[in-house]
Amino acid sequence: MPRRTATLEDVARRGRVPADGLRRVLNRPEVVSARTREQVIRAMQALHYVPNRSAQLLAGKAAPSIGLITASVTLHAPSQIAAAIKSHASLHQLEVAIAMPAQADFVALQARLDELRAQHIRGVIVSLPLESATAERLVQDNPDMACLFLDVSPEADVCCVRFDHRDGCGACVRHLWEMGHREFGLLAGPESSVSARLRLASWREALHSLNIARSTTVFGDWSAASGWQKTFELLHLQPRISAIVVANDQMALGVLSALAQLNRSGSQAVSVTGYDDTADSLYFQPPLTTVAQDFDLLGKRAVERLIALMAAPQLRIRELLPTRLIVRQSAWPVAAAEDRQQTLAQLKALVEKL
């Protein structure tokens, strides 16, 4: 007969520690006496309790770890960043403990930092858009924790590695302008998002530099569904829009779907650009013109800079990574759309003559 797997309750009885007390021991080992810690470890060993993360920490046998506080990995960009960080951390024999707060406010973030601290983690990468004041307070209130931020404004007085939003957004706008577009729709991310506001400001700055004073702006929530919905809103607000600049690839997917549903082709065709160059964007219909952010490079730099910061907390790390415009088939010259419509009309006339 197979042996029953030992539970935490079994360990508590064997070690003569109350069940609630045992859970506190596992969650906060640094506040437990050496005698109690040894008592719990002996009970786990006697019962052949399957070592989990907490037991390893108690025994001091866990692999060195860093923390990653990130937005939901159901979104493509955060999931790719998390994968890159884990991959490069493993090259340094580091494990990555991931925390995903429901909100990006100070209280929620501090709670996640406390959980990571309880796992003996002393270095954290924060990969979600944060207000400058929130990021700065996290650093000030946690002097024992090395914090590196990936999505803060240029004004934030914290250590960061981030992409150059201004360069990428400007490249998109200039590319469309060079193809004759003058009526722009701007589909931004949530107004509460720092990165969304930075991209929107960069688009508007680029449009202003090209003497385009008017554009129509709506705000989505990063999802394809919101991209689909907001396309109808944009075209209702300004039917003459010839190009829609979108703050991420997932919303751009929704935009392309809505335009296909509206049969916006020929002289009514609307060019679309995205942002992120996620793995799927090449296979959108049509393939998406977008701004590439090298997430693998971001993961590599983030891990390297966090290791350096943990070794020398006095370092001031502020690194800006380049972006790159990827030109595909979702954006075309205004004249080209009109030419296609004329070609179709000519072909139709020829067919009717046959």
From Swiss-Prot:
GO MF annotations for this entry?
DNA-binding transcription factor activity; transcription cis-regulatory region binding
Question: What keywords does the record list, in alphabetical order?
Answer: DNA-binding, Repressor, Transcription, Transcription regulation
Q: Which organism is it from?
A: Klebsiella pneumoniae
Query: What role is this protein assigned?
Result: Repressor of the lactose operon. Binds lactose as an inducer.
Q: Quaternary structure per UniProt? A: Homotetramer.
What CDD domains does this protein's entry cite? HTH_LacI (cd01392), PBP1_LacI (cd01574)
Q: What is this protein called?
A: Lactose operon repressor
Give a Pfam family name.
LacI
Q: Which PROSITE patterns match?
A: HTH_LACI_1, HTH_LACI_2
Q: Which residues form a coiled coil?
A: none
Q: Which first-to-last residue range defines the signal peptide?
A: none
Q: Which Gene3D superfamilies match?
A: 3.40.50.2300, lambda repressor-like DNA-binding domains
Q: Which InterPro entries does the annotation name?
A: HTH_LacI, LacI/GalR-like_sensor, Lambda_DNA-bd_dom_sf, Peripla_BP_I
Q: Name the DNA-binding segment ranges.
A: 8-27
Q: Which residues form the HTH lacI-type domain?
A: 6-60
